[in-house]
Amino acid sequence: HEEVDTLIGGTLLTQTGKDLRNIGVTTIRMKGRKVAGVDFRLVPLAGYEPDPVFQKQVDACYANPELNRPMGEFGNAANKWGLANWMAGAVADGIDAEIGFYHIGGVRLDSIPAGGVSAASVYGLEPFGTLVAEMKMTPADMRRMIVSKYNDPVNVKEAHRIDLISTTPYVIVTDQADNALDVEFPKLREGKVYTVAVSDYVYKNYNDLNYTDGKITEEDVTGLLLEELEEDSPLRIDNTPRQRVRRK
């Protein structure tokens, strides 16, 4: 989601940012069969008028009555943390897991106001077609997952923050340099094996996961959220953080 134009180890790395505000143009100069040079530029789209035919199609999508019809309602406004809490609870409930975790980067809206919640809002919140994954984990396994993510030396944008929002409270204990040392679970019993629900993104992409009986289920997150809206509205969203960081 950032604008990047850099050379790493002889490879041109470019990103055009988010919301389609730019397009990228790469120019490759050849001399015979050899590459003589490569350059890249970002072209802002703000100065370009939209194509009228395509704009009409986009407007029709946004005006779709089924997408804009309220599927249920929120009894209170939800902030980003509240939405993450809702999603963590939904993945847990969807597979009857004891604990749910949801990656904060997968929460694509910052807030949803109180009142009617449309299908479009839910698809905006979770646009990826994410499936629920199931694992058996002990608190030690969960601790390892959280500490490794907090100290991630590769994906530094997601490191040194609370990345995994959970239905169970926990405290990340760090040293003075903000390296995670431990995770305290006040409501879990050490050594017990719990059924844990996460997104398939976490299941497939997080390093240092330790678990048994892991699998990706057929339950999709968007469907679970829509089902809960339809069946249990008005929903009271808990915006209270259950996770925190404490410096040792």
Task: Describe each region flagged by the PLM.
Residues T16-K248:
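Catalytic centers of hydrolytic enzymes
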Residues I8-G10:
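Short, structured coil segments at secondary-structure junctions
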Residues E2-T6, I172:
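Short, exposed beta-strand/loop patches in secreted or surface proteins that constitute
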Residues H1-E3, T14-T16:
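Active-site neighborhood of phospho(di)ester-bond hydrolases with catalytic His/Asp-centered motifs
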